């Protein structure tokens, strides 16, 4: 390939001391190219950069599936809400993944779990959820250190988003009351979760 390779004899003719297989670079004078060629090159480079950015975004959020993230409401539509992360990347919260009592205003910060990342024609689409059981589980992991530390295990979750939920927990340490630890003193731990979920009635059993 003459655009990617150069023969050893050609390099030596230029007075360069290179061995077979080594990389050789040469300065390109863009003034020798026409305007059309330069514009074409610019377009190709912009396209490649955009492609790499999309690949990086897909890889980044594929690793975040199942994690809670916070986004800023940018635009609300009838069927979905558009949020932006702290780098300006777009994320979608579909209507069916919203708690019925949720009401979003532009500029408001919203927490949700990354449900999945679609990749249609190399266009990453980050889908969020607030109705997923996993969202409730992650909230408990944040509010209850014993769950995050593995001292308490969430065995099952049943939920009608925005209305009620049952969370079954257990501990292998007899010194820990799993229900009491999840609820907290005077309900301090569970109240934050209840507020986040639009006052969903949560029973811990």
Region spans (language model):
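RNA-contacting regions in translation and RNA-metabolism proteins
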Residues: 1-205
């Amino acid at each position: 390939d003459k655009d990617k390779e150069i023969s050893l004899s050609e390099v030596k003719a230029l007075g360069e001391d290179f061995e077979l297989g080594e990389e050789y670079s040469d300065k390109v004078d863009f003034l020798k190219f026409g305007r059309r060629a330069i514009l074409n090159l610019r377009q190709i480079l912009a396209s490649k950069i955009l492609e790499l950015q999309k690949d990086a975004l897909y890889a980044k959020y594929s690793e975040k599936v199942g994690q809670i993230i916070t986004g800023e409401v940018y635009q609300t539509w009838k069927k979905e809400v558009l949020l932006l992360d702290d780098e300006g990347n777009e994320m979608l919260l579909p209507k069916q993944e919203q708690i019925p009592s949720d009401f979003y205003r532009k500029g408001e910060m919203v927490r949700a779990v990354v449900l999945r990342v679609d990749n249609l024609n190399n266009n990453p689409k980050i889908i969020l959820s607030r109705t997923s059981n996993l969202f409730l589980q992650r909230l408990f992991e944040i509010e209850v250190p014993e769950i995050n530390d593995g001292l308490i295990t969430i065995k099952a979750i049943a939920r009608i988003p925005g209305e009620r939920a049952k969370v079954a927990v257990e501990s292998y340490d007899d010194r820990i009351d799993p229900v009491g630890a999840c609820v907290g003193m005077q309900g301090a731990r569970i109240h934050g979760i209840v507020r986040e979920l639009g006052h969903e009635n949560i029973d811990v059993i």
